[in-house]
């Protein structure tokens, strides 16, 4: 195998942001290309989702960076950040009272490490959202806001996707990493990647492309097929 790896975010990158909660995995064309690519190069998913969520949808990846870098799984090993703030669990009932979709992200060791408060269905953020976020920050939790995405993330650690990329790059024995992402939480990963790709869609037109290679999400299958052809030919 080559010493180059392809790492990608899940929500809004491999799966359109409107379909993340209901989709059983990436679109068929994307999934097929990734399955073939994983036979030639190392492929990893670096996501804000929990590992059990993404592993069930992309079981063929060589590595996973989950819950925004809090949990790493690769090569038969699993590592979870040691600095998890248990105040997140204490606030979980408060989050659920906001009357919007709340996604809890649990580590494989059974600790609540992340929460997404998502108002995509309602169109407007909850009235008490800012008060709740202020309380979370006062307790030392990491609140991650997005420019135009209709959700906010709260984490029990300040680990990030850049940490996940560095660790997975080392565990998988890679010299170079191509990283595909779409939002603010991908910036730390882009910073440490060798090739930085921004997947464009309706929620992220505000993100500047300086230093990034933009690809529209509808063009992703064709891009992956192009990469697949290149690595397949080079391996012959």
Positions of predicted regions on the chain:
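Asp-based phosphoryl-transfer active-site loop
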Residues: 2-20, 190
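Short, well-ordered beta-strand core segments
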Residues: 43, 64, 177, 196-198
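Active-site phosphate-binding/coordination module
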Residues: 17-19, 24-109
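Asp-based, Mg2+/Mn2+-dependent phosphohydrolase catalytic module
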Residues: 196-236
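Glycine-rich phosphate-binding "P-loop"
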Residues: 14-22, 149-154
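Short loop/helix-cap segments at secondary-structure boundaries that form the rim of catalytic
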Residues: 54-59, 188-192, 203-211
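Short, polar loop motifs at secondary-structure junctions
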Residues: 48-51, 184-185, 200-205
């Amino acid at each position: 195998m080559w010493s180059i790896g392809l790492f990608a975010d899940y929500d809004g990158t491999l799966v359109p942001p409107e379909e993340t909660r209901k989709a059983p995995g990436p679109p068929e064309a994307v999934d097929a290309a990734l399955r073939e690519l994983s036979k030639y190069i190392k492929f990893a998913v670096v996501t804000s989702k929990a590992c059990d969520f993404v592993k069930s949808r992309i079981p063929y990846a060589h590595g996973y960076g989950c819950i925004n870098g809090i949990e790493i799984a690769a090569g038969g090993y699993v590592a979870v950040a040691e600095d998890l703030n248990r105040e997140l669990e204490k606030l979980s009932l408060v989050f659920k009272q906001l009357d919007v979709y709340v996604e809890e992200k649990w580590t494989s060791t059974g600790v609540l490490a992340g929460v997404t408060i998502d108002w995509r269905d309602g169109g407007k953020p909850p009235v008490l959202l800012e008060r709740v976020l202020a309380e979370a920050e006062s307790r030392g939790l990491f609140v991650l806001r997005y420019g135009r995405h209709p959700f906010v993330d709260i984490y029990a650690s300040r680990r990030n996707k850049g940490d996940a990329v560095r660790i997975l790059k080392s565990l998988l024995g890679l010299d170079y990493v191509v990283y595909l992402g779409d939002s603010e939480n991908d910036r730390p990963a882009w910073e440490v990647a060798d090739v930085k790709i921004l997947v464009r869609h309706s929620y992220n037109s505000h993100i500047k492309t300086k230093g990034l290679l933009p690809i529209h999400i509808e063009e992703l299958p064709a891009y992956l097929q192009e990469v697949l052809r290149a690595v397949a030919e080079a391996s012959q």
